[in-house]
Amino acid sequence: MAVTGIVAEFNPFHYGHKYLLEQAEGLKIVAMSGNFVQRGEPAIVDKWTRAQMALENGADIVVELPFQVAVQSADYFAQGAVDILSTMGADTLAFGTEEDLDYSEIARIYEEKAEQMTAFLETLDDSLSYPQKTQKMWESFTGIDFSGNTPNHILALAYAKASAGKNLRLQPIKRQGAAYHSQEKNQMMASATAIRKHISDRTFVLQSTPSSELLLMAPQVNWENYFDLVRYHILSQEQLDHVFQVNQEIANRLKSAIVHVHSIEELVDKVSTKRYTKARVRRILTYILVNARENNLPNGVHVLGFTEKGQEHLKKMKKSISIVSRIGAVPWDQQTQTADRIYQLGHSDIKEQNFGRSPIRIEKLG
């Protein structure tokens, strides 16, 4: 039986995600972001709610990406997630994409020319952002056209790069429904962006998300729930460059801007430049919020939930890797657990995220 790995955020889970799980083969393992996501923002609902939505709609196992993997640029996000899925026994990597490309060939090219491609990046002007440099690299070595690029396309290339040299079959699945950033409500499959924007429209949410009651009943947050905390950190700390990925230039820009803004989006708009993209600034604000440091990644894999079929696979994997099913006095990953405690500050109804929590168990459906 195939073991298919899927990297996801499910922010929140919607019918496009359900379609992807339906198209994937065999046992399906999801490596999912925790309470903070790749583009640098708090997840709309907590990791346990999102994991349960996935398990009720086709996933067999959901494991958590550590904070330092989940809140990263595309390449680091993809590499960390693919490494975890490989250790979990995945032989196939399924992912959504808008483009009809031969990702296996792209992975082969990167495996053969990784050194040259990395050296090429070093020759590019520092005024370019890292995503712009990466696009130029792919254009030069593979001829890919980025004129209509989208986040899923960028991530798909990052997955191909991360899978180079690994025994992984790549299974790209064409995205269905609304575009990634679409805020439209009249689409057959609404995007996560649209669902977050219109979360107060109960009828729309019921139409757009499977297991929608889980989403509607869970405490919901966004960046504005944490703005005062971010402002406090920026104003009260004399130096910010001890925080992960914060240099003196960005620290100065943040300290200058924070006294003039009244929201996270205003702050991001004031601080971002061609070099410091909005996504990068949001990630930096997330690092400041949780006081992140550069740390080693945890050895164990934290399991958020599983089905009966998933449980059988986990029993086999316990012989070769460390499976963390319950977090007690000894931390799984201190940085992730600190981030979770801060996430709880965004809403008084968010439950404890780690201590005493056991994996969600879903009985066989249908």
Curated annotation (Swiss-Prot):
Keywords: ATP-binding, Cytoplasm, Ligase, Nucleotide-binding, RNA-binding, tRNA processing, tRNA-binding. It catalyses: cytidine(34) in elongator tRNA(Met) + acetate + ATP = N(4)-acetylcytidine(34) in elongator tRNA(Met) + AMP + diphosphate. GO terms for molecular function: ATP binding; ligase activity, forming carbon-nitrogen bonds; tRNA binding. InterPro entries: Rossmann-like_a/b/a_fold (IPR014729), tRNA(Met)_cyd_acetate_ligase (IPR008513). It is found in: Cytoplasm. Its EC number is 6.3.4.-. Its main location: cytoplasm. It is an enzyme of class 6 (ligase). One of its GO terms (biological process) is tRNA modification. GO terms for cellular component: cytoplasm. ATP binds at residues 7-20, 96, 152, 175. Gene3D superfamilies: HUPs. PANTHER family: TRNA(MET) CYTIDINE ACETATE LIGASE (PTHR37825:SF1). HAMAP family: TmcAL (MF_01539). Catalyzes the formation of N(4)-acetylcytidine (ac(4)C) at the wobble position of elongator tRNA(Met), using acetate and ATP as substrates. First activates an acetate ion to form acetyladenylate (Ac-AMP) and then transfers the acetyl group to tRNA to form ac(4)C34. Belongs to the TmcAL family. This is tRNA(Met) cytidine acetate ligase. It comes from Streptococcus uberis (strain ATCC BAA-854 / 0140J). The gene is tmcAL.
